[in-house]
Swiss-Prot record:
Main location: membrane
Gene Ontology, cellular component aspect: plasma membrane
Lineage start: Archaea, Methanobacteriati, Methanobacteriota, Methanomada group, Methanococci
Organism: Methanocaldococcus jannaschii (strain ATCC 43067 / DSM 2661 / JAL-1 / JCM 10045 / NBRC 100440) (Methanococcus jannaschii)
Subcellular location: Cell membrane
Listed name of the protein: Uncharacterized protein MJ1017
Alphabetical keyword list: Cell membrane, Membrane, Transmembrane, Transmembrane helix
Membrane topology, record value: Multi-pass membrane protein
Transmembrane segments: 14-34, 36-56
Length: 203
């Protein structure tokens, strides 16, 4: 069996090489818009999926944080539903210049913690809570977060935050007095240690 070998040279060879390169360029020009369109569709899908997921997470969070009280006091079978008033701290604009208003803002655990502070020396004055010479805002966290980073949300018009950590709000295991100049929105456990209030200080 003989194998025929064709040799292309001269102008014909140059023409074939030029033709192949031209076809490759045309293919690249045609494929590039398709590739860009596919990338845009994929990117849009990822972005839309993230936004939808974030939206439903926010809705679920807002639903969970609302406290619902159901009262059945009517005689005609009607049920009255009351949503508990709870105002979130936004941008440090919570009003703390009135003790009654401040206590109304606090959830049950934090309010119980505030009364614990009162039992160990804090003063409930008309314009807020005072502890060891500072106008303070109480925060209670029942447990350490996994990453050991404590999120602190506090109003602007205070001198310090008193943080109760672990245990119960009426008997926290750790107590920290953090002056305002050292406060951050997120603080690690190691950062908090320097502000811990020991038993001797409380006594």
């Amino acid at each position: 069996m003989k194998v025929k070998v064709y040799r292309v040279g001269g102008i014909t060879g140059i023409f074939l090489i030029f033709l192949i390169l031209l076809l490759l360029i045309i293919l690249a020009i045609v494929a590039l818009p398709i590739f860009l369109i596919l990338m845009a569709i994929f990117g849009g899908y990822i972005l839309l999926k993230y936004k939808i997921k974030s939206f439903f997470r926010k809705v679920w969070y807002n639903i969970r944080k609302k406290k619902i009280k159901i009262e059945d006091t009517s005689t005609n079978g009607e049920v009255k539903i009351n949503f508990a008033k709870r105002i979130e701290i936004e941008d440090g604009k919570i009003e703390t210049n009135n003790i009654n208003t401040l206590l109304d803002y606090l959830d049950e655990n934090t309010k119980s913690f505030a009364y614990y502070l009162k039992n160990i020396g804090a003063e409930f004055r008309d314009d807020g809570i005072y502890f060891k010479g500072y106008k303070i805002y109480p925060i209670f966290k029942k447990s350490y977060p996994i990453n050991e980073i404590i999120s602190l949300r506090y109003p602007e018009n205070i001198d310090a935050v008193v943080l109760g950590l672990k245990g119960e709000p009426y008997d926290p295991k750790f107590l920290y007095l953090i002056p305002k100049e050292f406060l951050k929105d997120r603080m690690s456990i190691s950062e908090l240690k320097r502000f811990e209030i020991g038993d001797m200080v409380l006594k």
